[in-house]
Amino acid sequence: MAQHEVSMPPKYDHRAVEAGRYEWWLKGKFFEATGDPNKRPFTIVIPPPNVTGKLHLGHAWDTTLQDIITRMKRMQGYDVLWLPGMDHAGIATQAKVEEKLRQQGLSRYDLGREKFLEETWKWKEEYAGHIRSQWAKLGLGLDYTRERFTLDEGLSKAVREVFVSLYRKGLIYRGEYIINWDPVTKTALSDIEVVYKEVKGALYHMRYPLADGSGFIEVATTRPETMLGDTAVAVHPDDERYKHLIGKMVKLPIVGREIPIIADEYVDMEFGSGAVKITPAHDPNDFEIGNRHNLPRILVMNEDGTMNENAMQYQGLDRFECRKQIVRDLQEQGVLFKIEEHVHSVGHSERSGAVIEPYLSTQWFVKMKPLAEAAIKLQQTDGKVQFVPERFEKTYLHWLENIRHWCISRQLWWGHRIPAWYHKETGEIYVDHEPPKDIENWEQDPDVLDTWFSSALWPFSTMGWPDTDSPDYKRYYPTDVLVTGYDIIFFWVSRMIFQGLEFTGKRPFKDVLIHGLVRDAQGRKMSKSLGNGVDPMDVIDQYGADALRYFLATGSSPGQDLRFSTEKVEATWNFANKIWNASRFALMNMGGMTYEELDLSGEKTVADHWILTRLNETIETVTKLAEKYEFGERGRTLYNFIWDDLCDWYIEMAKLPLYGDDEAAKKTTRSVLAYVLDNTMRLLHPFMPFITEEIWQNLPHEGESITVAPWPQVRPELSNEEAAEEMRMLVDIIRAVRNVRAEVNTPPSKPIALYIKTKDEHVRAALLKNRAYLERFCNPSELLIDTNVPAPDKAMTAVVTGAELIMPLEGLINIEEEIKRLEKELDKWNKEVERVEKKLANEGFLAKAPAHVVEEERRKRQDYIEKREAVKARLAELKR
């Protein structure tokens, strides 16, 4: 084989390193699942991003974690399928397209359903391209041959199958229920499309008169306009204040309708007066109470948020205008006796910004209890879904145990059309996979399904289900891991689990890895209103995908939120730069060595033995941490090994044989360096794929790409604990000498006498054998290693395991001058300690200052005391 060529520019340039590499990976088909029967399958389906625009940092974080998992599994020899895809995102996409039309002076109704959907498909194609290019920039190892979209024909078939099946089992029904209604977009919303904001409102206290004229009962509300639809007043059955009133009637002010006082355990006796007005058509809890007591449901609003005919004289008014008028009228009647300021959480539409109206509406629903029960039972078995961190299982189960009916219809055009038809004459409902034969007599339901309905089927619909003989379904389902944020455990994770159990009889994934949200440096949620959002593509442009990925993967503990920090991304770029420079130095000193020439059998230095031992330890630790999804700890383990052990120590020590004349020693060190660098690049590859591929391609290597290079294995025969212990002692000595130099302001270039005293013969022999390293790194003017060494009066000392270091100060510094300088420094630290102790003794300061300010002062006090004691110790040494 010809001499190995190295092509690494002197300076690390992330743009040059990353340019073209992704296309090269795709061309090599390294990310495509092979179906190889000799390999175990490993599957992840990507949480499909909405096809509405740019990916944000949360997506970058989520997909980086998945890429780290799948890259490692691929290297471990699994047949990996990481399936990409996108979500049609119903209301989010429709709102964007409608906004575009509005700018042209058009509405969707001007176009009609068919033309509008054509426009939306065009939008989808454009933005899907943007998303793919962002995935490419991040370096995600996706199998594009299996890319899916939630409105693909195959997935649409799965949606119809599930709808029809649940309908026939009586688990999907059409009926009245309270839903989140957006009066601007005029559609039902899922809970995740509702944003809650703290609003300064009012609590209105009213007295409803008893129908027999014997008194009144007090109630309070934040929405007085809904009183027009009240059909009862509820009290707790055990409330002694109201027991005598249960069953009596109240005369509803303004309306004049008589409504009953009922007993229900839902009522909180401690809150307000302990009596609650019940409006079953405008509040979800009231709706449930109404069902229990067979109360009528009176809707007082239209779909656009104006009052309807049941609102009598207020008909046609906007709901908030109606509120003002009703308040005036109730005050005039003496019914409203108190208005108090009240800050409360109010739901707003994520899309239109409108205040959400809990609204009684005829919609399609899924009965959730039977589906939820199967998911709850699964968690009591050995085959349960494992949540990482474990605490999120409680969150998941709590939601399942308190589940409500799921409203699945949406008054939109973009989405999966509900496969239900109504007979034009009889009103009969027909539900099936295909339209009725005599279609001219039927009209299809105009609504579409909630986006979460189709995404709940994502793990198996993408594999070809309902065709259970599909090769991908048989091989890659169930999937292995789902990676997602804690904010969609209810909306998505839980629904995938119960649909997976219902339709495949299997859990859709073994593990659910939960991460938090990305926040800004101050811990605030990123939002358009705060203007604190960060575009991951901008970060990649400035620092590279490798730096961003490493930061995202290591920046928080499992399940915790991540604070974005430009400084930390920059520090990661510096880490990449360090790797580049160290690797380039190593490669430039390989002497053109080829892979076939690598030979680890030669006589090794103590540094060689140590780095090979440390590499084995790192491989073992990193592999174990990966199994537990400990990305942060795994990244830090690699960082410490690369920065400290490899770059700061081993490469520096390797310069001795590399620059020496012994060709055999040179060859062994080159082989060790190449072996360690190769394995280190593989360990780091899942985190930083671009730079590791670039360096690995320049190393003597076997194989086409690092993406498919085998995962490093511990090789016990390369560990030498005794030599590693010797190396640790050398490092301790060198560090101690460097610390002494720093303390006495002596630069490394100035020689310093070093006497090492040891009574341990083994230590003495080891130090004598490795004397060259001490001479290279301590720069001694004189080096003595013995059981007895001179002990001058003026000297600095340090103790390491098995030896005492003595460094004479005579001639090194002007001792009198140094004593004067240190006395001045001691005076300074005494004053600082006195000042901070005075502050901490001040009761006023302790009572008024924020906790973190007090804590900072305590930290300063500790720091100043430590510095003072160090100066005292140095003075004592010099005055001996």
Swiss-Prot record:
InterPro entries: aa-tRNA-synth_I_CS (IPR001412), aa-tRNA-synth_Ia (IPR002300), Anticodon_Ia_Val (IPR033705), M/V/L/I-tRNA-synth_anticd-bd (IPR013155), Rossmann-like_a/b/a_fold (IPR014729), tRNA-bd_arm (IPR010978), tRNAsynth_Ia_anticodon-bd (IPR009080), Val-tRNA_synth_C_sf (IPR037118). Keywords: Aminoacyl-tRNA synthetase, ATP-binding, Coiled coil, Cytoplasm, Ligase, Nucleotide-binding, Protein biosynthesis. Changing P47A: Has little effect on amino acid activation. It comes from the Bacteria. One of its GO terms (molecular function) is aminoacyl-tRNA deacylase activity. A motif ('KMSKS' region) lies at residues 525-529. It catalyses: tRNA(Val) + L-valine + ATP = L-valyl-tRNA(Val) + AMP + diphosphate. GO terms for biological process: valyl-tRNA aminoacylation. ATP binds at K528. GO terms for cellular component: cytosol. Monomer. Catalyzes the attachment of valine to tRNA(Val). As ValRS can inadvertently accommodate and process structurally similar amino acids such as threonine, to avoid such errors, it has a 'posttransfer' editing activity that hydrolyzes mischarged Thr-tRNA(Val) in a tRNA-dependent manner. This is Valine--tRNA ligase. It comes from Geobacillus stearothermophilus.
